[in-house]
Amino acid sequence: MLTRRSVFKPDGLKKLDFEYVPPRLPHREEYVERLVDFLRPIIERPGAISERVLITGRSGTGKTVTAKKTGEIMERIARNRGKKLIYAHVNCRATGSKFALVQRIIHQVAPALPVRGYGPIELLHALWDYLNEHDCFLLLTLDEIDYYIRTTGEDIVYELTRLTDEVKNVPQRINFIFISRNGGFLNVLSPSTLSKFRPQERFDFPPYNELQLRDILAERVKEAFNENCVSEEIIDFIARNTCKYGHGDARYAIQLLLAAGLIADRDGYPMVIPEHVREAQEKTDPRLRDEDIVVLNEHQKLLLLALARSLADRKEAVFLPIEEVEEAYNVVCEEYSKQPVGRVMLHALASELKAAGIIVIDSNFRLGLDGVKAEVMERFLENLLGKGR
């Protein structure tokens, strides 16, 4: 009897949200420490200089969460020292105009300030006046700044950064963290904007590797899922798929984990199984096309059908030994009145399917499926091959 108890803890879904900032950031703690060290003068010598940092890296490399964690720590340090520091984080992709960008900044820093009836430049000066009147300092992250400049222009960025320079003999109230996929957008800035914008420090974030993704997923599983609902094998499965298909994107990995958990709940399972991950991947980022299967030769299709059936029967398995798949293959060949190939040729067929990106093979030559549910693959192949005898 399948239980209807959720695999998630009561607040588990929040712990898998992209906006969530976990207590620990595996494999990004060093970057947080370096950022805090670089930005520490904001607190130790407030107003002496406007600090500007650029963080670059592909999607899912931890740029946003690292900036937010840095902001949390900087606010805490300032509070403990009796200083007023506000951290604000604006995703520029969600702002389609200069006004919308400034409005989002003000909403986080001084929500009581009226914004209607004013232009973006007037609002920037109102923000500056607010910071001066309240003796506050601002650490502002402009996330996806490259997208904003490409689609909206550089004017407001110039005005923001110029604001800290044009008023002399007063504390520099605004400090910046800029986040971008890469630093290429700097090359398209006008000389006047670049002179104001140019960061003093740059941090380049590499993609996560498989071991690092395992650590990240393991932490999220502890926070989000009930005990024994996600096995180490499932964590390894998602980490490996993320490296193979998601290019080390931690967001992709967490998205797969969340989707697989929701599928487990939908089907009434007490734990996440490989089929849930395969279905989640199929929905999140489908990899296999019908034509990829249609063009296979006859025995490749028969072997693939044998693997799909075996995995559908063994829902808890990520991989199956080649010997077990060979037994199923022999049964399938008998069903379709075909002479099975020998073991050497069977290994060659499996290697060909792997090279085509249709199956995966681990270091022990166990076979598995990625990107599609075993049951879906089984039905498709049975329709393609027709009914056996």
Residue ranges and their predicted role:
Residues 53, 77-94:
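Conserved catalytic segments around the Walker B and adjacent sensor/switch elements
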Residues 46-71:
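Walker A/P-loop nucleotide-binding motif
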Residues 286-318:
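Short alpha-helical segments that sit at the start of domains
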Residues 2-13, 17, 45, 67, ...:
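Mid-core helix/loop region of P-loop NTP-binding domains shared across ATPases and GTPases
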Residues 263-288:
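Conserved C-terminal helix/linker of AAA+ ATPases
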Residues 1-50, 73:
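A short, basic N-terminal segment
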Residues 311-389:
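Terminal-proximal interaction/regulatory segments of ATP-powered molecular machines
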Residues 243-249, 258-271, 311-314, 355:
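AAA+ ATPase "lid" subdomain C-terminal helix
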